[in-house]
Amino acid sequence: MNNTLNQHYEEKVRPCIDLIDSLRSLGVEKDLALPAIAVIGDQSSGKSSVLEALSGVALPRGSGIVTRCPLELKMKRKKEGEEWHGKISYQDHEEEIEDPSDVEKKIREAQDEMAGVGVGISDDLISLEIGSPDVPDLTLIDLPGIARVAVKGQPENIGEQIKRLIRKFIMKQETISLVVVPCNVDIATTEALKMAQEVDPEGERTLGILTKPDLVDKGTEETVVDIVHNEVIHLTKGYMIVKCRGQKEIMERVSLTEATEREKAFFKEHAHLSTLYDEGHATIPKLAEKLTLELVHHIEKSLPRLEEQIEAKLSETHAELERYGTGPPEDSAERLYFLIDKVTAFTQDAINLSTGEEMKSGVRLNVFSTLRKEFGKWKLHLERSGEIFNQRIEGEVDDYEKTYRGRELPGFINYKTFEVMVKDQIKQLEGPAVKKLKEISDAVRKVFLLLAQSSFTGFPNLLKSAKTKIEAIKQVNESTAESMLRTQFKMELIVYTQDSTYSHSLCERKREEDEDQPLTEIRSTIFSTDNHATLQEMMLHLKSYYWISSQRLADQIPMVIRYLVLQEFASQLQREMLQTLQEKDNIEQLLKEDIDIGSKRAALQSKLKRLMKARSYLVEF
């Protein structure tokens, strides 16, 4: 890199790249995408040679798949005279590298450990850090070369495995794809470029690198120039062309420094490609310069979005952690207090739920909306039953009159007929009332179970204990409530109300009847010689009393249900759960945490820690 570039970017380039490297080393990439340059290419495209030329170290070479894991290559430019430094890290392993010649061996060892000895691949990242005066400030991610055909020892779908791994990286909007293509193949047929175009049709984050210009067939040189000039397959970021060490030069032990000089001479002296050198589109040093500028620009462009993503992830992680709670402490005394707090919070929420007050835990459960709806249905049932009763009593009154009328003269009300018909109607309401009780009892049980699940997430034994108590209390209280309802209906079979109440109801019913038919018609009916007047009078009495009885039942049945199935349920649950705290021998068993919940909480705490660290890095930047 030239001095002007170094001076201009000395305070800007390294901090930018270091920031992203630091975020990646924190593991933030598990949570969100980071700006990166991913290097992709078909097998034998010259990808490894380009990376070697940029990094100054030998990387695994050979036939078939040599890059078997994503390799993060972090290059840090040192001042002249400072010593070369290397470090490789993967999974929980970290190792310093003293000699550049050991790099290839260390990468192979890492790949064997992560992807197995042989030709398999792995998604796990190997990080290689190189510090030297001869490297640019740059971080690249090298991905396996695209294999078209599986060779011996490889799975049949190796090609698809590699493509899936490559897509995982290049599909992210934060990734620049560095596509390596040999000059001696038809660029339109290269798999790597096709894949880049699939995820980046406009080529806005794709940079093409042409390799092996010395192997171009005579007469096709101008096609190569046209490609680099962006006239064949357009990429917004354009193309570069480089000439790296070939196999012959490697065998002859040509150093990378000498190879760079030979590359420069090759382009300067080439009849067709010299224009590309003059325009700054050729050689490894120019490529390094462009890549550094592209990466820094890309990082700066991505930072605002990155900050937003980190804030969103932090908020999301905090919310998730709140759901899982803090987990039980280690100290035995503190564990007891933890259990007391947990059980007390649950029982208080149960009481609040039964009284319609807001719950301390913030859980959104509302049993009263269900009760109001169901009690409304019960009242509607009473009204509809009354309407049906009114429609059929005329015929029934006549039948009862014939059956039960004794020595009375016409026009006298038969109280026995009245009583039998009232009791018959009330008996028909008992079954629906008990059914309504069971429906509401089941709905309340479900709400309490939801509250228990929310309160005791991650503590299966504590949850099981609460569920067992809820089921038992439900059975007992439902049975008690049913008994009380049936007693209520037995009492309703005693035909009684205050005289004033009955008189008022009778007057109301008569007034309604008067409004429904003309006065003359009423008079003619009342004073008719047959017993129709008696029937009309009887119907008025029946309607009047049913109205009183149904008003009592409309309130009394819901009150019994609400008291026993909800209010007493919550109180009994509170007593029994608090009683659990007296059983000291069960404390450890009750606080036994679900393994999955514990590990999930630990993962979330780790995620929160790295996101907060990442935020602090961005704030300090």
Curated annotation (Swiss-Prot):
Entry keyword annotation includes DNA repair: no
Domain GED residue range list: 535-621
Described purpose of this protein according to its UniProt entry: Does not inhibit strain RB-1 of the fish pathogen, infectious hematopoietic necrosis virus (IHNV).
Region (G1 motif): 41-48
UniProt record similarity statement: Belongs to the TRAFAC class dynamin-like GTPase superfamily. Dynamin/Fzo/YdjA family.
UniProt xrefs under SUPFAM superfamilies: P-loop containing nucleoside triphosphate hydrolases
Positions of region (G4 motif): 211-214
Region of interest (G5 motif), residue spans: 243-246
Region: G3 motif, residue numbers: 142-145
Family annotation (InterPro entries): Dynamin, Dynamin_GTPase, Dynamin_GTPase_CS, Dynamin_N, Dynamin_stalk, G_DYNAMIN_dom, GED, GED_dom
Binding site for GTP: 41-48, 142-146, 211-214
Induction notes from the record: By polyinosinic-polycytidylic acid (poly I:C) and viral haemorrhagic septicaemia virus (VHSV) strain 07.71 in muscle, head kidney, spleen and liver.
Domain Dynamin-type G: 31-304
Protein name (record): Interferon-induced GTP-binding protein Mx1
Source species: Oncorhynchus mykiss (Rainbow trout)
Renumbered residue ranges of the record's region G2 motif: 66-68
Alphabetical keyword list: Cytoplasm, GTP-binding, Nucleotide-binding
GO cellular component: microtubule; nucleus; perinuclear region of cytoplasm; plasma membrane; presynapse
GO MF annotations, alphabetized: GTP binding; GTPase activity; microtubule binding
PROSITE patterns according to UniProt: G_DYNAMIN_1, G_DYNAMIN_2, GED
Keyword Nucleotide-binding: yes
Pfam families: Dynamin_M, Dynamin_N, GED
